[in-house]
Amino acid sequence: MITFLDRIALSSASGTIMDELHITTVQWGWILGMFTIAYAAFEIPTGWLGDKFGGKRILIRVVLWWSFFTIMTGFASGFMMLLCVRFLFGMGEAGAYPNTSIVLSKWFPVLERGRAQATIWGASRLGAALTPFLVIPIQQKYNWQTSFYVLGAVGVVWTLFWIFWHKEEPAECRSISKEELEHILATRDLPVHKKDALKISVWSGFKSTNLWFLLAMYICYAVGAYFFQSWFHTYLEKGRHIAKDQLIWASSIPYLLAAVGCFTGGWLSDKACLRWGKKWGRRVVPMVGLFVAGLCIIGAALVADNLTAIIALGIGMAFMDVTAPVAWAVAMDMGGEKSGTISGSMNSAGLLGAYLSTVFFGYMASTYGYYLPVLYIGIIVFIGAFIWLKIDATKKIQFAILAPEVNK
């Protein structure tokens, strides 16, 4: 939830920032894209660090970095400064979700991971839905800068809570029962590390065609997801000319529905795995989700009525986010002990697609208007549904063994 707050705050203030700092639509696309490309570049290294040092330590660093640059966003005084701040922001925030997956892989059995990921993603969407109700009144009463100062303080409070509350391993938690601990350790499907562990080549995993299909699917998903995170508010305000007093609800409705989609997707996928096995249980639910989402976004781009478009986009985002927890659960299933690296790779691929799409959106909107870029986003999301037919969650990625690694 924490790492989504700044994105929605920036999107909510986009019109005001562009007017106040004299930023064009094309330049705004570069600002949004700069965060995304930095995030993509550092996602895999930060996921690897989490595999090596543990998710708790890396998440502490990520959120403290997030808090600092959320506050720094409020100090931006022009295009170049905001561009630099957003690049550094993305560089440090990278790895948040891969390291969350590392934490979940240690604490949850395999067949509960869909629901665990659904809780994480549902909370992020719920936070995104509530953020406009917090930041827009602050922006209207004070200024857009103040909203970023407030959000930065929220991240510091979360970090203090995380330091004292979370334990890296279930065995370190005093409140867990012996029976529950034994159940988690027996069903989480992680290797037991021995003194003389085998050193493996992480990069050898990229020979897996299964992984490449996962990356391709996530690009399609991320193109749609980042439209809502980056351009959606601007699309409503400048593309559909929705009044400022209506923007809070118009911006929040899709995220409220998306939270329902996240919770539903994870729950349905876990249930489907029990009924049809992990291969089809992890495949059918997100495939239907992206199929319906693509149709809804395409429909929203083509209708003239604002209310109909907002409803269609809300339903589309709900079905699209059915995919999110399942995709991350599949990355955990396929990656095993390297789930941080694999989920980081998946997110990096998605972010690369989101970067190109975000920048391209600005150029298309300034040249052709807002309906055409929304249309192409819907088509890409629709294509992602069919890629799920080539993804098999039962096929773990095989990593090449290099040499024994002796722990001293």
Segments predicted by a language model, with ranges:
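Conserved MFS/SLC helix-loop-helix module at the cytosolic interface between two early adjacent transmembrane helices
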Residues: A41-M80
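Extracytoplasmic gate region of multi-pass secondary transporters
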Residues: L10-S11, F206-G265, T323-A324, W328, ...
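A membrane-interface helix-boundary motif in multi-pass transporters
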Residues: Q140-A153, A243, G281-V284, Y363-I380
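Helix-loop-helix hairpin linking two adjacent transmembrane segments in secondary transporters
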Residues: I120, S124-C173
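Structural signature of the two symmetry-related core transmembrane helices
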Residues: R57-M72, W280-I298
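Helix-breaking motifs and short loop linkers at transmembrane-helix boundaries and internal kinks
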Residues: H22, G54, F75-M81, G92, ...
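Cytoplasmic helix-loop-helix junction between adjacent transmembrane helices
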Residues: V85-S124
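A late C-terminal transmembrane helix in Major Facilitator Superfamily
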Residues: M332-Y368
